[in-house]
Design a protein with these regions (language model features):
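Extended, regular secondary-structure scaffolds
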Residues: 183-194
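Inter-helical loop and helix-membrane interface segments of multi-pass membrane transporters/permeases
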Residues: 10-18, 79-93, 146-147
């Protein structure tokens, strides 16, 4: 009895210590959030003060409102339950978070960014967008439970890489807009004003040495401050759920939701690498070489940004932050920490056409037939998918070569034109397949398990 009593008391003491530890972590996190809210609010006031004389009231309105929002959140953290407020705010936002809405937001923003590039490259607009993104991230972090508040190394790497990518994309488009304005006025681009000879010794070596020291120091601080995302030793009796790949491969894992493993893991990455390798040989346009420009290369820039940001980065973000157990889409609510959307069983195109639209179930009896007849019947079953893919990958390039893309066809020649169309149509097939999965619950356009072929 004494032993059991001592064990119970020790267990209660350990539990109380754990609770006190989580309370300390929660207090530190809320304190850090309040400090960040105050600092960002002060930064917005500094922007307003510096732009007060030369900016209009419309340009000063948004940073003023953002400063009030951040100061209000900081004040709420002092006098009220900040995490409760942030949980309610994140719950209201999570209602609109779906794979379709995230993709639509990214794709739509890319379209508007290229359409109104001059507007979005202004400093005030970029500052407002940065404030909104930081506010969303802080609200998401502040609304988590204490045991979920630790940001892993993979998550931190993704956030940092996304921030660096967004900055350099914005900076490149800003340089392109500036060069377009100069060339429109009859001047040379900024890059043409640089000296033909750039000193490399010792000027460049000094810069490289300083950068190497800074990067090494950053890696040391990273290793000391951030816990490495290492899993426990492998146990054949325990399977992690979800078992996620590293952040640089999680995009391919997310692509498995929409494509077969042979397509998502082999064919599509291989075509992406081949496309990047042969791009200099397919694109012989001398414009835009050596300087930033948007007006002279709109199609090339739009295709690259859509493939890199609209597809690859979308897959990484959804796979890293919005996939839970059984790879179900995760959303947050005020009643439960996370809710998993249970996906319905997807249908193939042949099942939708023959069974749902025409009411024909003849192909279900194919297993009783001899093997030769099963193969013939399988081709007849997948006839809608074969015709659709043939029209997309063969008929559409043939029609474009005789109408909209006649000049490109004559300039590139037959071989280069068809190879370029194969790369472009394959890339565009990825978002089309996503839309078909979201809107029509379509799994495969072509499903031939007899030959282990799924597309």
């Amino acid at each position: 009895l004494y032993l059991f009593g001592d064990t119970a008391a020790e267990t209660t003491s350990n539990q109380s210590q754990v609770d006190l530890g989580w309370q300390a972590v929660e207090a530190m996190k809320l304190g850090a959030l309040i400090v960040l809210f105050v600092l960002i609010g002060v930064a917005n006031l500094v922007v307003v003060a510096r732009q007060a004389r030369r900016a209009t009231w419309k340009e000063l309105l948004s940073p003023s409102i953002l400063a009030l929002v951040f100061f209000a959140l900081a004040g709420a953290g002092v006098v009220a339950d900040l995490r409760g407020i942030l949980k309610i705010a994140s719950a209201q936002l999570s209602v609109f978070i779906t794979p379709l809405s995230i993709a639509g937001l990214i794709w739509g923003f890319l379209v508007v960014l290229l359409w109104r590039a001059r507007f979005f490259t202004r400093g005030t607009v970029a500052w407002n967008l940065l404030n909104i993104l930081v506010l969303i991230v802080l609200v998401a972090l502040g609304s988590m439970e204490p045991e979920q508040s630790i940001v892993t190394g993979d998550h931190l790497a993704v956030l940092m890489a996304l921030g660096v990518t967004a900055f350099f994309v914005w900076f490149g488009i800003r340089q392109a807009v500036a060069n377009d304005e100069r060339m429109k006025a009859g001047q040379k681009p900024w890059e043409a004003l640089y000296a033909e000879k750039v000193p490399t010794w010792p000027d460049l070596v000094y810069i490289e040495a300083i950068c190497a020291v800074i990067v090494l120091g950053g890696l040391v601080l990273w290793g000391l401050a951030v816990k490495a995302p290492l899993e426990a030793p492998a146990n054949p009796a325990v399977t992690p759920n979800p078992a996620k790949a590293p952040w640089y491969f999680v995009g391919l894992q997310e692509l498995l939701v929409y494509f077969d493993a042979s397509i998502a893991g082999t064919v599509l990455p291989l075509l992406a690498v081949i496309g990047l390798l042969v791009l200099p040989f397919l694109d012989s346009n001398p414009k835009g070489c050596g300087y930033y420009t948007l007006r002279e290369r709109p199609v090339a820039i739009a295709v690259f940004l859509f493939g890199f940001l609209g597809l690859w980065w979308y897959l990484i973000l959804v796979g890293m932050f919005f996939r839970g157990a059984d790879w179900a889409f995760v959303r947050y609510s005020p009643s439960a920490t996370e809710e998993l959307e249970v996906a319905e069983a997807a249908n193939t195109l042949s099942a939708i056409v023959w069974e749902k639209c025409l009411g024909i179930s003849l192909f279900r009896e194919a297993d009783r037939l001899p093997r030769v007849y099963r193969y013939v019947l399988a081709l007849g079953r997948e006839l809608p998918g074969i015709l659709l893919l043939g029209a997309y990958f063969l008929g559409l390039p043939w029609w474009l070569a005789r109408n909209l893309c006649r000049q490109i066809y004559e300039k590139l020649g037959k071989g280069k034109y068809w190879f370029l169309q194969l790369l472009l149509l394959t890339m565009l097939f990825i978002p089309l397949k996503m839309l078909l999965r979201w809107l029509c619950n379509l799994s495969y356009v072509l499903a031939l398990p007899e030959w282990r072929l799924f597309f």
